[in-house]
Amino acid sequence: MTMSDDNENEQPLNLDIPDHLEYSEEHAWVDRSVDPAIIGITEYAADQLGELVFVDLPEPGARVEAGDEIVELESSKAVQPLISPVAGTVKYVNRDVADDPSVVNGDPYGEGWLLKVELDDDEPELLSADEYAKVVR
């Protein structure tokens, strides 16, 4: 997910970046403490996109590779793909988000999760919360 850097000269953002999650530079988060792993978009991505009006999710059983466009997020501002931070097989999708995309804006790290993926054995290259904070600040 490519976000503009319009806020380069503004004050640091007051973003929620939970420590227990891992992040991609494309503004996805991954919770690998559970199986299957949970994937969503960060608060930063949700804020940049604005109010979501449509989310196109893959079907359970779909194969994803790190770097694939796996979800399409549409807002009144833009249509952006979510780039998969991991490789694996989609086990579950959040149908609540498909029915009401605004759930992602309201709770991107909780009820607004997007996918649950059974991960391959490959170790994904992800960022810690502190490393991700440097990307968005």
UniProtKB/Swiss-Prot annotation:
PROSITE patterns: BIOTINYL_LIPOYL (PS50968), LIPOYL (PS00189)
GO cellular component, one term: cytosol
Cofactor detail note: Binds 1 lipoyl cofactor covalently.
Cofactor requirement: (R)-lipoate
Keyword hit for Signal: no
Superkingdom, natural source: Bacteria
InterPro entries linked: 2-oxoA_DH_lipoyl-BS (IPR003016), Biotin_lipoyl (IPR000089), GCV_H (IPR002930), GCV_H/Fam206 (IPR033753), GCV_H_sub (IPR017453), Single_hybrid_motif (IPR011053)
GO biological process terms, semicolon-separated: glycine decarboxylation via glycine cleavage system
Keywords noted in UniProt: Lipoyl
Summary of the function given for this chain in its UniProt record: The glycine cleavage system catalyzes the degradation of glycine. The H protein shuttles the methylamine group of glycine from the P protein to the T protein.
Subunit structure comment from the entry: The glycine cleavage system is composed of four proteins: P, T, L and H.
Record-stated family: Belongs to the GcvH family.
Protein name per Swiss-Prot or TrEMBL: Glycine cleavage system H protein
Taxon lineage: Bacteria, Bacillati, Actinomycetota, Actinomycetes, Bifidobacteriales
Gene: gcvH
